[in-house]
Each structure stands twice: as structure tokens, then as C-alpha cells.
Design a protein with these regions (language model features):
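Carboxylate/His-rich catalytic cores and anion/metal-binding grooves
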Residues: 49-81, 229-239, 519-560
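Short beta-strands within extracellular/lumenal beta-sheet-rich domains
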Residues: 136-150, 189-192, 249-252, 393
């Protein structure tokens, strides 16, 4: 497999890539880094919202208007929900609680909780759960939260939002709404059953919560939301004909009535060109063609939500549009801009800015409330409006009366500062010297569009062809699916000593940064395409020991919690696994490079780890 991938780096061949027949668990769309990572979780691109890999919505709508008829080909019009009873991230709440098992009926309104303590929510391990306001690290907790509701909610759609680590059972006025079993998740939504909505009353209500902390982190938080009027403007969908995942791009084909539409999401992650690989701009290419021989009037509508630049949808965002050079830009970001202000697992970026851009010729744009934007597009004149900090971005490409037309959008993110490395904030690799702007990156991406797309097509064809020869068709399709995912699971930055740092983010484990046992299974890809990136997977672990910041005689597990690389935060060491991983990867680097220079540079610490393994390797503590 490695040999097949390696030869794909060679001179481009004039080969048309065969379509992948794989039905992927999720389809990669915009792949830049662990934060700007957008996927389709559904078979058809229009069957559900575009999402971040954590499962939270990255709203992105795509609609074709053909001779006045609407066809939605991407995303869905998202549910708009208003806070009714706030979570700890939306406002302050207090409750009675106990960590000792109460008598039966504790979830009912008439239960006497006078002997229980009072605390502020959320409840959890405050050292590693930023929303926890009351320390709870014991095995169990029972909580009774009184909530005042002013509105009559009969007949409304009401949702419970909850975060839990681990098992949680939640009642609303004595009606069980959620029983999670053994799991730990954040910002989940559960629609209240009719019985629970019927039990809601104007005045005082009771939310009763049980949570079991099985191990490590603990957290419990919840609130209620009510659905706004959710009129749908784009009910008719296109018909998806195919989807095809290649290494650099994901291709879709649709029929929109008398017009066929092709879409390609491209992230040019070429590991032999680090400036291009880290350029934080992906392409969305469209191609329309009449399927009945006649000309048709075609407009394409693209709408992105502020969630691309927010951790939580209730955060306040600021949106704007502007032109620079030949590009029209739309931009959104959080109002607060706390750079590197959040760390953790199920967390998205809320500093920096998301951009959507296109050629300013035949483009129009607007920002504002989603329904207003959509209706104005249907009515033929895109119109801006204002919201309370949740403006959406809308971009329309007018293709005119045509039999065939094509073009592209640019989607990107400027994270300003990417990683904190032992107290120092580091810029992204593409702006490592602080002399680049995001607009210059977009301008380069636009100018180089044709050349980059040709290069991507050649790479995709070669990878699929040669991986098929080595491992068969299904193996090749897996290689193509894994390619962008594996690279974009990392962030590349330059250390103060000019070392490359290629830092991974753990997902749905604990959010660690630069974890050795995450590095180990992904390393073959980087050893094949650029051994300097393989070193970038190890440099921080060597530095951590060689600097004396980590003084144990074995390799660390990680260097922090993403994106803060200030030292190991994982609770347990894994000395045998991590030391063995580092030794094997260093040896593999020597084999690929044909010399042991990298090992020589780190010989002292490698010797320390080897001595540890010689003494304890066959009899590990744990």
C-alpha cells in the first residue's frame, strides 16, 4: 500500500480517475484542519445538514433556480430554536443536588429536597470541564432544578438540550425524556414527547436529573428550547445521481429538472508542497448543462451559517461582505474573539473568521436572517436583513440563459493563531512569519485554480490506479476516503526553534493534542509522502523530554489538550506503548530517508526510553 501511494507522487499521468463505488460512512466536503472540517452524513447531499465531524451543524445550503423553479441540492433548512430554560452556557442556573441515593419519587414535584445542597450548574469536574460551576467528581449525582416558564407551550415543539458524562436520566415534571445509557456527549437535542409537553405549565416546572460518572471527567448540564416558526422555502430537492470520493475531492452529480449539475468539493492537500497543503482554502466547483437541448435561466444560491466560526449556535456572531481584487467575500466570526480561548474534545473554534468568496462578476450577496434571504432569492432580488448576532451568509451566482456554464466558490478559514505551544501562541504554517493575509491566500487559490484542479485530478487518478494494483479496488477506495481525513486531522505550525509541528487532535476520547498512539497508526501516510511531516508528528514529544519539561524516563502520551500544547493533560501514562511507538517511528524515518541523522539528533532520549523498555517492557505496570 505504501509503495502504491508513493509512486502517486510522481509525474502526473493523463489518467481519468475511476469513480469510487464506496458508500462512505460520511462524505468529506471541506477539509482544512480539525476545526474547519465539514462532512455530509447522509447518502444524498440534500438529505441532512452539512456537519462538523463532531456531528454539530455547519449549515450550508445549496439551491439551483432553473427557469424560476427551485431545486435544493445541498443541506437542509435548519431548525431554529429559542432558549426557554437556559443551559450554563446560555445563562446562570442553580439547583438542589445530592451525591447520596435519595428515596423513590425524587424526580417528582412533591418530593422534599430540603436536606439537599444547593449549587450552580453545570455540575462536573471543574479542572477539565470549562462549563462546570459546581465541583462533582463522585460516582453519582441527583439534581432537582426548578424552572419558571412564562409561555403556554401546548402544541409547540419543545426540545431538551443536554450534555452528560457519563450515563444520564432526565425527567421533565416527572416524565422521563432521556435515558442515555453508558455514553458521554455534549449539546445533544431530544424532542420532548407529547406527554412531557402536556406536563409543562406556566409557572414553576421541575427538571430532575440523575448522572453516573463512571470514570475520569464528569459533567451534567441541560436546558429547554422551543421551536420558532419553521416555514420551509426550499422543499423541492434535486435528484442525486452519484457521489464519488477521491483522494483530493468529492464529486456529486444531480438532475435539477431540465438541467444537470455537477459539484466537486476539493481540498488540495499536497504533502510535498506545505504552503499549498496548509493554505486554508477549499474549492467548490459547479458545472451545469442542459439535458434537453434548450437554454435555461440558471441561478445558484449558497448559504452558510455562522456556526462555521462558533463553538455553539447561540453565540453572537458578526457578518460582513466586501470586495477585494476580483473577488466578492462574505465573512463571519464570533463577536468575542477569545483567541485560543477554548480547549477540549467536543469543541469547535470560536475565534478567527470563516469566508466564502466568488468572482465578483455575476455575483450578488447578502447577510441576515435565513428565511428573509431565502424568500428574497425566490422573489428575484437578494435582500439583506439584520438579526441579533446570527446573520447567515448568502451568495448568488447568476449564470444567465445558458446550455452550459461552470465556475467555483472558495471556502476558507483564518484562525489567526492556531496552537499554544508551551506558552507561546503560534500562527498557522501558511502565515508562520506573520506577513500573509487571508485575502492573499484566497487570491492565490483563485489564480491557481486551473493548475491546482489539473494537479488534483492527476493525483486522484494515480492513487486510485496504483492502489488498486497493489491492494484491489476496495483498498484503493479506502485509501482515497482516508487521505483528506488523515491530513486534516492535524494542524501544521512552526515551533519557535523552526521545527515542524504536525499536531493531531483526538476525537471523542479526551481531545488530547499530539498523542503518540494517534501518531503511530497514521504515520505511514506521512512517511510515504513527506518524511518531514512524520518528524513533525514526533518533534514535540522529543522536545518535551529534552527540555526537561517532561522528566519521566519514557515518552509522554500527549502534550496537552487541543489546541493548548503546554504539557501532558491525560491522566494516565502509557510508557510501554508510547516509548515503543516513538522508537519504531524513528527507525522507520531512518529507513525511508536512508540515514539515521534524525535518530542521532535525539539519541540521548531514545537511549533513555530504550533502557526503560529493556527493564520494564515485558512486565508493564498497567
Amino acid at each position: 500500500g505504501a509503495a502504491a501511494m508513493l509512486s502517486s507522487c510522481g509525474a502526473p499521468q493523463d489518467v481519468k480517475s475511476e469513480k469510487s463505488e464506496m458508500r462512505a460512512p460520511a462524505y468529506p466536503l471541506v477539509m482544512i484542519d480539525p476545526y474547519t472540517s465539514a462532512w455530509s452524513f447522509t447518502d444524498n447531499l440534500y438529505d441532512g445538514p452539512v456537519k462538523h465531524w463532531t456531528g454539530k451543524d455547519f449549515p450550508f445550503l445549496g439551491v439551483a433556480k432553473v427557469d424560476g423553479q427551485i431545486y435544493r441540492f445541498m443541506g437542509t433548512e435548519e431548525l431554529e430554536l429559542l432558549p426557554l430554560v437556559k443551559t450554563s452556557e446560555q445563562g446562570r442556573w442553580t439547583a438542589k443536588y445530592t451525591t447520596k441515593k435519595p428515596a423513590d419519587g425524587w424526580q417528582n414535584a412533591d418530593f422534599n429536597d430540603a436536606a439537599w445542597k444547593e449549587g450552580e450548574g453545570a455540575f462536573g469536574t471543574m479542572e477539565n470541564e470549562s462549563t462546570a460551576k459546581t465541583q462533582w467528581g463522585e460516582e453519582y449525582i441527583w439534581i432537582r432544578r426548578k424552572a419558571d416558564i412564562k409561555d403556554n407551550l401546548q402544541g409547540k415543539n419543545v426540545y431538551l438540550e443536554y450534555s452528560h458524562d457519563d450515563d444520564a436520566i432526565i425527567y421533565v415534571n416527572g416524565v422521563k425524556v432521556v435515558d442515555t445509557g453508558n455514553s458521554a456527549k455534549k449539546h445533544m437535542l431530544a424532542k420532548l414527547p407529547e406527554e412531557a409537553v402536556a406536563a409543562l405549565k406556566q409557572g414553576e416546572n421541575l427538571i430532575a436529573i440523575y448522572c453516573n460518572n463512571r470514570v475520569a471527567n464528569a459533567l451534567i448540564d441541560c436546558g429547554l428550547l422551543v421551536e420558532k416558526d419553521n416555514t420551509q422555502n426550499f422543499t423541492q430537492t434535486a435528484v442525486q445521481k452519484s457521489v464519488d470520493v477521491q483522494a483530493m475531492q468529492t464529486n456529486y452529480e444531480f438532475t435539477c429538472g431540465p438541467v444537470d449539475l455537477k459539484l466537486a468539493f476539493t481540498s488540495p492537500l499536497f504533502m510535498d508542497n506545505l504552503d499549498l497543503m496548509t493554505r486554508p482554502v477549499s474549492y467548490l466547483t459547479y458545472e451545469v448543462a442542459s439535458n434537453d437541448g434548450n437554454k435555461h435561466n440558471v441561478e445558484l444560491y449558497f448559504e452558510a451559517g455562522p456556526q462555521w466560526a462558533l463553538d455553539q449556535p447561540h453565540q453572537e456572531a458578526v457578518a460582513e461582505s466586501f470586495t477585494e481584487g476580483n473577488l466578492l467575500y462574505l465573512k463571519t466570526g464570533s463577536r468575542n474573539q477569545e483567541i485560543l480561548g477554548k480547549k477540549g474534545d467536543d469543541v469547535r473554534i470560536d475565534w478567527g473568521y470563516f469566508y466564502m468568496a466568488a468572482d465578483k462578476e455575476n455575483s450578488s450577496c447578502a447577510t441576515g436572517e435565513g428565511k428573509t434571504l431565502r424568500k428574497s432569492f425566490i422573489d428575484g432580488k437578494l435582500t439583506s436583513s439584520k438579526t441579533d448576532g446570527s446573520d447567515k451568509l448568502a451568495l448568488v451566482r447568476s449564470l444567465g440563459e445558458t446550455k452550459k456554464a461552470e465556475g467555483h466558490l472558495l471556502l476558507g478559514y483564518d484562525d489567526l493563531y492556531s496552537i499554544q505551544y508551551f506558552g507561546e501562541n503560534l500562527r498557522p504554517y501558511w502565515n508562520r512569519n506573520g506577513n500573509e493575509t487571508i485575502q492573499s491566500q484566497f487570491a492565490k487559490a483563485d489564480k491557481e485554480y486551473d493548475a491546482v484542479m489539473d494537479k488534483c485530478a492527476a493525483f486522484d487518478a494515480n492513487l486510485m490506479k496504483e492502489a488498486t494494483e497493489v491492494g484491489g479496488r476496495k483498498y484503493a477506495e479506502l485509501c482515497a476516503l482516508a487521505y483528506r481525513q488523515a491530513i486534516a486531522a492535524h494542524k501544521l505550525v512552526e515551533a519557535p526553534n523552526k521545527d515542524l509541528l504536525f499536531l493531531s487532535k483526538e476525537n471523542f476520547s479526551n481531545g488530547s493534542i499530539g498523542t503518540v498512539d494517534i501518531t503511530y497508526p497514521s504515520a505511514p501516510l506521512f512517511l510515504v509522502y513527506n518524511p518531514e511531516l512524520a518528524k513533525g508528528l514526533m518533534n514535540h514529544i522529543f522536545y518535551y523530554s529534552e527540555s526537561g519539561k517532561w522528566n519521566k524516563p519514557f515518552a509522554a502520551h500527549d502534550v496537552g489538550t487541543y489546541p493548548l500544547a503546554n504539557g501532558q493533560t491525560y491522566g494516565g501514562d502509557m510508557p510501554i506503548e508510547e516509548s515503543g511507538n516513538m522508537l519504531i517511528l524513528t527507525a522507520a524515518t531512518a529507513v525511508v530517508e536512508g540515514n539515521a541523522d534524525y535518530a542521532q539528533k535525539h539519541w540521548d532520549v531514545l537511549t533513555t526510553w530504550t533502557d526503560y523498555l529493556a527493564q520494564y517492557g515485558l512486565d508493564p505496570e498497567n
